[in-house]
């Protein structure tokens, strides 16, 4: 998405002026983009033309559209599975669509890796840094805006409701929202209401703020999109990218019983040698 938003591509980069920008300055709105006619700039100072599409962005668009199609098909099958759990055809379809969409995801992510690889034909550290810095800017930007939104909604001041963030995700503490709505201890009802709150209130707000970001930076396209991934009642973080969530809803699929989402943490770890129980000499 960052490649598409800033039109990052080997043939569209037209300048590099790191003294003009930084993530912090752009977050404060201190970078003047008024003179950037048909140009945009990433927070590391890489400048890209926006009067014609780059081949890399067009390629990413194709793969992203393809991935979205198969991911939607997978979610449809997952919803069916909640009503017909023993159906092997549904299980096979879920595996098939998941494999296809994951293959597209890997291909999408590999574009950044290729640009940052000195053995790649299109290696350019300015573009690789541009993607990284733009990602930091986008996440920190929306983290601020979501905190502002929830503080305003809950009539609080300077409370950090975003408890963690990743390269393309934020994790929001919604307990105070649940209390304000007076939802009580019915977890399934709470999950249902939060699902609607995210879709009808939070997501439109995020879309609006990301459009403001795109307008500010004179982006080629507004491609920053955030969708609700999971709703969980408990979570444990040991470090960045290392967490466990007790999930009741995953991408719109409601679970009868919660499932653990484990990321970056060993579910089973052996720190010593296990002796064989049957040893023949």
Residue ranges of model-derived segments:
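Helical catalytic core of nucleic-acid polymerases
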Residues: 1-145, 149, 153
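Catalytic palm active-site di-aspartate
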Residues: 67, 159-175
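Short, glycine/acidic-rich hinge or "gate" loops at secondary-structure transitions
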Residues: 80-85, 150-166, 212-224
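Catalytic palm subdomain of template-directed nucleic-acid polymerases
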Residues: 171-197
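Phosphate/diphosphate-binding loops
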Residues: 200-212
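Short, conserved secondary-structure transition motifs
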Residues: 224-239
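Polar, glycine-rich mid-to-C-terminal structural blocks
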Residues: 245-264
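Conserved small/polar residues in nucleotide/adenosyl-binding loops
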Residues: 271-277
């Amino acid at each position: 998405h960052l490649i598409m938003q800033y039109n990052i591509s080997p043939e569209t980069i037209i300048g590099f002026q790191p003294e003009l920008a930084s993530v912090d300055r752009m977050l404060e709105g201190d970078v003047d983009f008024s003179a950037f006619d048909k140009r945009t700039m990433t927070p590391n100072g890489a400048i890209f033309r926006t009067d014609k599409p780059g081949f890399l962005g067009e390629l990413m668009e194709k793969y992203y559209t393809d991935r979205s199609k198969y991911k939607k098909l997978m979610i449809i099958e997952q919803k069916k599975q909640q009503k017909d759990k023993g159906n092997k055809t549904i299980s096979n379809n879920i595996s098939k669509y998941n494999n296809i969409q994951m293959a597209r995801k890997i291909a999408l992510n590999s574009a950044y890796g290729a640009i940052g690889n000195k053995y790649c034909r299109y290696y350019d550290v300015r573009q690789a840094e541009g993607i990284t810095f733009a990602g930091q800017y986008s996440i920190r930007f929306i983290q601020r805006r979501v905190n502002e939104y929830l503080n305003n909604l809950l009539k609080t001041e300077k409370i950090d409701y975003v408890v963690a963030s990743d390269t393309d995700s934020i994790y929001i503490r919604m307990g105070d929202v649940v209390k304000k709505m007076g939802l009580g201890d019915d977890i399934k009802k709470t999950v249902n209401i939060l699902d609607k709150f995210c879709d009808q209130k939070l997501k439109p707000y995020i879309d609006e703020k990301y459009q403001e970001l795109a307008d500010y930076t004179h982006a080629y396209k507004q491609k920053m999109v955030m969708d609700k991934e999971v709703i969980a009642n408990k979570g444990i973080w040991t470090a960045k990218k290392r967490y466990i969530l007790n999930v009741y809803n995953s991408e719109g699929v409601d679970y009868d019983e919660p499932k653990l989402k484990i990321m970056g943490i060993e579910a089973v770890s052996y720190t010593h040698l296990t002796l064989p129980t049957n040893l023949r000499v």
